[in-house]
């Protein structure tokens, strides 16, 4: 009795209610195998019945690649396994074309189910669906504006690196992911929300952290059965943090949008062509008076673009630190290509060794083991007779990119020149570009649902690499490369990793190029 009095006197009612709800949810989880009569452990080692759901998810989170290999060793075409998002049908690479059939395999529904879009604060379409549909055309429009955007992005990269890495000519440690994240956020924000907001510290923090916070919230919610998720998300701290951050973003976006609208007032039907492109203004013009949520539209663009670009930039920088012999050839390429006209969209396209380095890094370290996910709206029979029931969530892993000698000789070996050599072969030249998706490289997806932002991501990373390579020397800390990490399907480098950098002296043609950066 005394302990109960102490608990109720020191804990607020809302906290006690949360604890009670948590206890009920935990009970539901432990009882879930009894209630459903379904075991989710399919390819996993056998687990005890009491926590089979939690254990199988734990196996997936820690050993996803090994489990997929195990599954394909038993069933080379397709098999079922459990993930932290529920059961999935895993298909082999030979079914890639079949998954491009929208009549049978739906992308939007897979995304909706994976990222819980029906929950308030998880990009819910409560004001209509325009802000969700607008992302792809907005990114396409932004891609068409890369020619005038690149010089502006280059100036932003210079400012960002000076802030994050300083001009210190002595070697000093820098945290890799946060500093590159800050630079990527500035470049992306310039194109997303325009020059007036792209240096706002609060907005930049949202830009970098929103996706991470959202992923954390989804992972926490996945602990609970789906029928409880619409209730528990209201009280779970990661979900509450996400909703608070969306409101914080709204307080920045709406005044910026009001300013954009004022620029178009006084009878101006079209936007000033001399004002830099921003998806914020473009979205509003595209909406043409239709109801939409401009904040959610921007956060959707952030969610699908920023974190993957930061992840890719980090991995490329790590590879350069691991292979310092690549740095001088890359510097020479930049000087040769950019020597006449400076850093432009056209010159970025001609940085072929850099392009090959990026594509090879992505081949071995994509953002995910499985970038292609679909949901079936009807029963489907594949070419080899495999039956995919209606309502199945389907995944196609990328592992063939580093585990198939018939596609890539020495497939487990990093070779920065691999795709540069492919350009010399007429049969493979068209597959060599970093932005090209194909049957042998699916890191950006495949078919008409290939990532539309890959061109912008490519230019962003190349701009940053040009500035880094010409302005800084790089070293690993204590000779140790940042560790490769896995969590479920996610593949990333240690987010706490640091490297050593110093500002280098530049002379001759390099100095001339930098003057135009």
Swiss-Prot record:
Name the predominant localization: membrane
Q: What are the GO cellular component annotations?
A: membrane
User: Which Pfam family, an example, fits this chain?
Assistant: p450
User: What does the record say about its membrane topology?
Assistant: Single-pass membrane protein
Glycosylation sites recorded in the entry for this protein: 404
Classification via PANTHER family: CYTOCHROME P450, P450, PUTATIVE (EUROFUNG)-RELATED
* Name by which UniProt lists this protein: Cytochrome P450 monooxygenase cdmJ
- The gene is cdmJ
């Amino acid at each position: 009795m005394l302990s109960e009095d102490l608990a109720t006197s020191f804990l607020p009612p809302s906290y006690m209610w949360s604890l009670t709800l948590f206890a009920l949810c935990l009970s539901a989880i432990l009882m879930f195998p009894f209630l459903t009569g379904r075991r989710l452990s399919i390819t996993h080692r056998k687990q005890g019945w009491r926590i089979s759901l939690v254990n199988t998810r734990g196996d997936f989170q820690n050993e996803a690649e090994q489990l997929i290999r195990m599954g394909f060793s038993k069933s080379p075409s397709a098999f079922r396994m459990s993930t932290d998002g529920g059961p999935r049908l895993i298909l082999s690479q030979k079914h890639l074309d079949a998954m491009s059939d929208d009549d049978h395999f739906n992308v939007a529904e897979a995304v909706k189910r994976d990222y819980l879009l029906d929950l308030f604060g998880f990009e819910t379409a409560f004001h209509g669906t325009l802000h969700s549909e607008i992302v792809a055309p907005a990114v396409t429009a932004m891609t068409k504006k890369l020619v005038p955007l690149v010089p502006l992005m280059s100036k932003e990269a210079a400012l960002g690196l000076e802030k994050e890495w300083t001009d210190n000519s002595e070697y000093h440690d820098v945290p890799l992911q946060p500093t590159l994240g800050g630079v990527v956020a500035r470049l992306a924000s310039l194109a997303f929300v325009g020059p007036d907001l792209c240096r706002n510290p609060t907005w930049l923090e949202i830009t970098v952290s929103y996706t991470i916070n959202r992923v954390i919230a989804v992972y926490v919610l996945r602990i609970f059965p789906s029928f409880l998720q619409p209730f528990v998300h209201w009280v779970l701290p990661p979900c509450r943090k996400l909703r608070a951050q969306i409101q914080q973003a709204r307080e920045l976006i709406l005044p910026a949008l009001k300013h954009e609208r004022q620029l178009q007032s006084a009878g101006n039907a079209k936007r000033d062509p001399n004002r830099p492109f921003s998806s914020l203004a473009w979205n509003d013009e595209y909406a043409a008076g239709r109801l939409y949520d401009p904040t959610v539209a921007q956060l959707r663009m952030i969610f699908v673009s920023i974190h993957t670009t930061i992840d890719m930039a980090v991995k490329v920088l790590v590879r350069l630190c691991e292979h310092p012999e690549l740095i001088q050839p890359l510097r020479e390429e930049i000087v040769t290509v950019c020597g006449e006209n400076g850093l432009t969209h056209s010159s970025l396209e001609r940085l072929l060794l850099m392009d090959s380095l990026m594509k090879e890094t992505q081949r071995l370290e994509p953002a995910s083991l499985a970038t292609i996910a679909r949901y079936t709206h009807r029963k489907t029979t594949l070419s080899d007779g495999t039956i995919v029931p209606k309502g199945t969530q389907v995944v196609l892993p990328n592992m063939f990119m580093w585990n198939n000698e018939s596609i890539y000789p020495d497939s487990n070996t990093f070779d920065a020149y691999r795709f540069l050599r492919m350009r010399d072969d007429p049969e493979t030249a068209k597959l060599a570009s970093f932005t090209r998706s194909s049957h042998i490289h699916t890191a950006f997806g495949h078919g008409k649902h290939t990532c539309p932002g890959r061109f912008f991501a490519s230019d962003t990373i190349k701009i940053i690499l040009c500035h880094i390579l010409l302005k800084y020397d790089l070293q690993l800390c204590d000779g140790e490369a940042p560790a490769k990490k896995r969590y479920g399907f996610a593949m990333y480098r240690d987010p706490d990793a640091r490297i050593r950098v110093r500002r280098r002296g530049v002379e001759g043609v390099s100095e001339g190029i930098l003057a135009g950066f």
